[in-house]
């Protein structure tokens, strides 16, 4: 089949790039643990073996490819080769905090994609992006454009100089020619200015339209910030995005506008009063241009980055659409893995994109496609070839349900991106005994600046207002994980919180002491597990795999099970997230020792519990 707008195939031999990286070896902490067994990820897919083609597949399925004209410049076939090499330094946006620009290095090159690493941090925070992404910039861009650069951990801000850093560490900066002007819409209209107000869709909760501010402008893109919320909800979009609308759009279209968090009397929010009180201006309505519908339709085929395992791109089908999004299904996989993605996401591509850019394509598996080598451990999840890990890029593969991003136990976990900034400040928040409720609530500054406000997810805050009617209404273990383990900065999953929310009908107040509903009370824990009493969750979260195994070995009657935790590469954070089901059914540990281990985990979690007043006074959330 003739590919539309096909460019010549790009040569991206990752092995050659790895050979060039001898002098740019990553820090000791970034080294990936090696398994004794051969990783299943070394088995090539059917596509890699040359046994699969889009032309044949479309004929067999009697399917149609999504027309290449529907894809944006960032999604379609690239015009240039990927010239980045492993070890090159650059500046770029932290996907978890879109307002933050960081020192990055290229950790891996695959086709037209890059795995980027935050200098000074563990590789579990690495993320994937396209080589032509507008989120990455050459060394010195922040200084030139007057953006703050977040320097590597361990360096002083006032002492950091790019050229000195590169020279001292014998590093290479990415050449400026690799970063091209990517402004398809021309220069930004002067009508858009930083600090102006508008109404914007919350991409994490697309049913909500909220009061927002233009927090930054780069080329033809806006940084949307939701007033009085932390920057994890921010996002970049172009000026014609359907996600941004002029002030008054909700009122004109019969939609509910969500007022800023902490705004008095949010039901009677008035733009006139708000603009006057904040001494700000609205973006003129005339500068907003209506974008044409995205044009994607159900049953169209395309290639999509797998959000659960972002090093992979899979054959996919659109199964549903709405105004701004498409719902994708990975061919050959169960529909439980389907999810919604923005129609303008850089992670969706026309068919043939992988072939043109030299990126492996994960195709629908057949029984005879999966070849298992003698002595090779096999992931039990149907369709999974053992590539990737729930703990992120730190581990290249897995061979059990515990590490599998697709296993039922991990299906709702948001594992693709860890939040290094929240985890970095965790210890500071815990050690600050004067950290009062008022500090975690909104500061009532609605000027669009990134104040240090409540960083809990909106759905988690809503969970605090749930009334537990009975054990059948809410999974207490999951609710405990959301309310107690996560509020002060450990990883959380919005999808996980949402799942818990949807299991309850009544919304009122939640018990301020969820620990009382768990298998053992605190006093009983202290008596049965005296060695656990003085250890806090923040300490456990920093444990290595060996330290977790050593702790399990120290528990009476659990000595022989320590090797199981070592085999599964369970570190402190993973240990805190284990459930009783994980320990008994997945790790195959007998009930007696499993209960002792699980009750230790509960004890650690309880040490992280918020003060009663903070739990009971959950803030009102949007919607």
Curated annotation (Swiss-Prot):
It comes from the Eukaryota. Keywords: Chromatin regulator, Metal-binding, Nucleus, Repeat, Transcription, Transcription regulation, Zinc, Zinc-finger. It is found in: Nucleus. MBT repeats lie at residues 52-152, 160-260, 269-364. Its main location: nucleus. Residues 10-35 have a biased composition (Basic and acidic residues). Residues 1-44 are annotated as: Disordered. This is Lethal(3)malignant brain tumor-like protein 4.
């Amino acid at each position: 089949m003739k590919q539309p707008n096909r460019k010549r195939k790009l040569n991206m031999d990752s092995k050659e790039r790895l050979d060039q990286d001898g002098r740019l070896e990553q820090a000791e902490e970034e080294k990936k643990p090696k398994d004794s067994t051969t990783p299943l990820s070394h088995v090539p897919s059917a596509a890699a073996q040359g046994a699969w083609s889009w032309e044949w597949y479309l004929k067999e399925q009697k399917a149609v490819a999504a027309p290449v004209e529907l894809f944006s410049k960032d999604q379609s076939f690239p015009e240039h080769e990927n010239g980045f090499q492993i070890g090159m330094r650059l500046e770029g946006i932290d996907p978890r905090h879109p307002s933050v620009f960081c020192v990055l290095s290229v950790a891996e090159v695959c086709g037209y994609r890059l795995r980027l690493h935050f200098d000074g941090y563990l590789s579990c925070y690495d993320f994937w992006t396209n080589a032509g992404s507008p989120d990455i910039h050459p060394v010195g861009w922040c200084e030139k454009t007057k953006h703050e650069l977040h320097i590597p951990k361990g360096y002083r801000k006032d002492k950091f100089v790019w050229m000195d850093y590169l020279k001292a560490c014998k590093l290479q900066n990415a050449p400026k020619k690799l970063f091209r002007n990517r402004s398809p819409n021309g220069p930004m209209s002067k009508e858009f200015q930083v600090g102006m107000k508008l109404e914007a869709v919350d991409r994490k909760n697309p049913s909500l339209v909220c009061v927002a501010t233009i927090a930054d402008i780069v080329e033809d893109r806006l940084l949307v910030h939701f007033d009085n919320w932390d920057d994890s909800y921010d996002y970049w979009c172009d000026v014609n995005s359907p996600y941004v609308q002029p002030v008054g759009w909700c009122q004109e279209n019969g939609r509910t506008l969500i007022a800023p968090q902490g705004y008095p009397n949010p039901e009677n929010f008035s733009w006139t009063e708000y603009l006057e009180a904040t001494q700000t201006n609205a973006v003129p309505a005339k500068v907003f241009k209506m974008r044409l519908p995205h044009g994607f339709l159900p049953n169209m085929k395309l290639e999509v980055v797998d959000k659960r395992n972002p090093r992979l791109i899979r054959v996919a089908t659109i199964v549903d659409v709405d105004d701004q999004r498409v719902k994708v299904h990975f061919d050959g996989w169960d529909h439980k893995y389907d999810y919604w993605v923005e129609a303008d996401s850089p992670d969706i591509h026309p068919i043939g994109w992988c072939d043109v850019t030299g990126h492996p394509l994960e195709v629908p598996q057949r029984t005879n496609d999966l070849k298992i080598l003698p002595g090779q451990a096999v992931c039990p999840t149907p369709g999974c070839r053992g590539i990737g890990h729930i703990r992120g890029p730190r581990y290249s593969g897995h061979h059990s349900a515990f590490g599998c991003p697709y296993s039922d136990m991990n299906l709702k976990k948001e594992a693709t991106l860890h939040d290094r900034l929240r985890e970095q400040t965790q210890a500071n928040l815990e050690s600050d005994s004067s950290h009062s409720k008022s500090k975690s609530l909104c500061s009532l500054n609605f000027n669009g600046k990134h104040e240090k406000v409540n960083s809990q997810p909106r759905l988690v805050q809503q969970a605090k207002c749930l009334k537990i009617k009975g054990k059948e209404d809410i999974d207490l273990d999951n609710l405990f994980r959301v309310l107690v383990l996560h509020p002060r900065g450990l990883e959380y999953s919005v999808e996980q919180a949402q799942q818990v929310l949807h299991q309850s009908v009544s919304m009122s107040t939640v018990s301020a002491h969820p620990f009382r509903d768990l298998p053992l009370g605190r006093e009983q824990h202290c008596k049965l597990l005296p060695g656990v009493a003085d250890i806090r969750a923040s300490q456990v979260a920093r444990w290595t795999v060996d330290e977790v195994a050593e702790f399990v070995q120290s528990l009476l009657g659990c000595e022989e099970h320590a090797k199981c935790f070592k085999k599964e590469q369970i570190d402190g954070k993973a240990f805190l997230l284990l459930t009783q089901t994980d320990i008994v059914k997945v790790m195959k540990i007998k009930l007696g020792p499993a209960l002792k281990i699980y009750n230790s985990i509960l004890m650690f979690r309880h040490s992280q519990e918020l003060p009663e007043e903070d739990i009971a006074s959950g803030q009102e959330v949007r919607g």
